[in-house]
Curated annotation (Swiss-Prot):
GO terms for molecular function: structural constituent of ribosome. It comes from Tupiella akineta. HAMAP family: Ribosomal_bL32. Belongs to the bacterial ribosomal protein bL32 family. GO terms for biological process: translation. The keyword Cytoplasm does not apply. It is found in: Plastid, Chloroplast. GO terms for cellular component: chloroplast; large ribosomal subunit. The gene is rpl32. Its main location: plastid. SUPFAM superfamilies: Zn-binding ribosomal proteins (SSF57829). This is Large ribosomal subunit protein bL32c.
């Protein structure tokens, strides 16, 4: 089994964690906005079909 020869410094560990967390945060924000746009579009379509049904 592979074992590291030297201990990784705390600063390097924190740096890697920070990079990973920033990537995760960026993806979470992107997913939120995509879901938000999809929700708004769905609500708009429902409103339009509701208006069309009431006019008839």
């Amino acid at each position: 089994m592979a074992v590291p020869k030297k201990r990784t410094s705390k600063s390097k560990t924190n740096l890697r964690k920070t990079v990973w967390k920033k990537k995760a945060l960026k993806q979470a924000i992107q997913a939120y906005f995509i879901a938000s746009r999809a929700s708004k579009k769905l609500n708009l379509e429902k409103a339009i079909t509701k208006d069309l049904n009431t006019e008839s």
